Amino acid sequence: MIWNLNKLNLTVLNLIWCDIMTQISDAKKGILTEEMKHVAKIENVSEDFILKSVAKGTIVIPSNVNRDIEASGIGAGLRTKVNATVGTSTDIVDFDEEVKKAQIAIDHGADCLMELSIGGDLDVIRRRVLDMSPLPVGSVPVYQASIESIREHGSVVDMTEDDLFNAIEKQAKDGIDFMAIHSSINIETLTRLKRQGRVTGLVSRGGSFMSGWIVENEQENPLYSNFDYVLELAKEHDVVLSLANGMRAGSIADSTDRAQIQELIILGELIDRSREAGVQCMIEGPGHIPINEIPTNVMIQKKMCSNAPFYMLGPIVCDVAPGYDHIVSAIGAASSAKAGADFICYVTPAEHLALPDPDDVKEGVIATKIGAYAGDLATGIIDGSQDLAMAEARKRLDWEAQYECAMFPEAAHAKRDQRPPEEEDTCTMCGNFCAVKIVNEWLDKSDSDLIK
């Protein structure tokens, strides 16, 4: 069966949808859900703020009706969230390793996970991650549809519309909380890309799958032409749509170009349709982008997409540091959070080089958490009380209090223990010449008439 719901009577479609309750449809009716209450509590904001923001679509709460998780809010006025990706490749298929990586990401403060496997039994690994994760879990359904098409038919371009929609439906039923949907890779955006040209072309895996399908089949992307059916499937399970940026630049040489902006215009239109249908939605943003263009990108996205939550991938702010791209991304994360981005996908030291191992995942989460924190500190989302407590503990040379104030206390403790000082109130960097100790002993205690 080929789905072509654009031909359905929209009145009938609206009747189908109207009985299904989602976070956004509840909020529009003034209904405060338990998930909204929880988000308000952990974010230290009013329930009324959350209710109104979810109703407007400026905050989303990924929480599939088929899973019981700790709800997390993403959007304006909330702490910037960090996503960690896990998943097999065609070269390395180790389900236990992926579950271990997911647990490491959770332990080090990731707010959400995405399961992006393309090797092995994709249903099994997805369900294992869903079963173990107390966090929202996202996916990219076109991966499964494409990989299974290759296995069954020999090619991505032989994928059917049913393959695409069946993958979305299956993953929604499994409990996936948010999905990257590549609806904006269409004839219009591909035409714009071809006319313009690029250094690195398309680097989105899902975008490359769909662009190949469109060109070979000489048909419009079903995820665009039948977007109403995507909305119906998402609404049934209250899945947040993360409208994917298949046209994102793969190098800073291609950043903020016409193809990217063309896609953003289409995404803005899809946001309006999603909200009208009662489906929560956010927008994915650039991957490779220089620092000076980050505020511009956030501003354009917020205006074109009616202030929908913005999900930045990294971003990578220079292209010449493979092996250290988690540091590059932390810089991008801080700049993005400061500019108003709402959700950051981590980058690991293995980016552009290999499938991340558990240590890579740990380093990626830590770096991105620090970047997001720094951005939130600059905007005032974080009030700085933890930083003040750390400053006061350092002034007192109170090492235990410093560990308690640290984002990652085990790392701080381990580093000091590796090279212990002769005197407990100092460290081996300065020893007896510690500036804080000197000031504490002489300047602060001085009763000199000269310095009052």
Q: What do the predicted segments below correspond to?
A:
Residues 22, 26, 34, 38-310, ...:
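Alpha/beta enzyme core
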